[in-house]
Amino acid sequence: MNILEVSHIDVSYGKSRVISDLSLTVSSGSRTVILGRNGVGKTTLLKSLVGILPISAGSVVFDGSDVAKQKPYQRSLSGIGYVPQGREIIPLLTVNENLELGSLGRPKLRFEEKKAWALDYFPMLKAHLNRNGGVLSGGLQQQLALARCIICEPKMMLLDEPTEGIQPNVVAEIAETLKRIAAETGITILLVEQNLKFARKVAENYFIMQKGTVVASGLTDGLDDETIRKYLSV
């Protein structure tokens, strides 16, 4: 079953079209990476899926419903979680307050219970609950952003460059944690990533973008050197 079906979408910044006639499908519970050189529209695609940028043509169907005209908060309530590039935690709020922000809009959510559940995946945060997010290392900030995303148990997580500016040992931990989250919760993961080693470790499937559209796709195990040279080498 597909949780996400994107059909022939266009996305523009003013008069400049960035995404053109792009289509892709993502299976429920899968782990998928979007690859491509800088400037091909990967971040723009994620922003259009979460509703930050409007699409000018095509359709976006999430969990059986057309969400193309929904606002970002409506897509969030429908089950789309998002961790943007740069993490965008609130630096003057504590770790605990940042996590509580993730639960806003969910009146039936028992915050302390869900916080304990989320921290089980990111236990390093437990020692920092009363520290401001802005003083944490990049690795801890990324873990906080991911914990804040999963605290409401989204159906799908959109992650934009989750390894950016993070030490290799923390990158490896995040890779294993994302795989564990997907396996134990059934949350679908769709990420944009430049780190090919990380992408291969986390994702089962890939899409490659070039000039604002998808030009290749398949299983990450089958991503060969020729395809990498053609579409990803600088």
Where are these regions (language model features)?
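ABC-type ATPase nucleotide-binding domains, specifically the catalytic core motifs of the NBD
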Residues: 14, 70, 95-113, 121-123, ...
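Helix-to-loop junction immediately C-terminal to a conserved catalytic motif
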Residues: 50
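Conserved ABC transporter NBD signature motif
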Residues: 58-66, 78, 111-115, 131, ...
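Conserved ABC ATPase signature
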Residues: 132-136
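Helical segment within the ABC ATPase nucleotide-binding domain
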Residues: 172-185
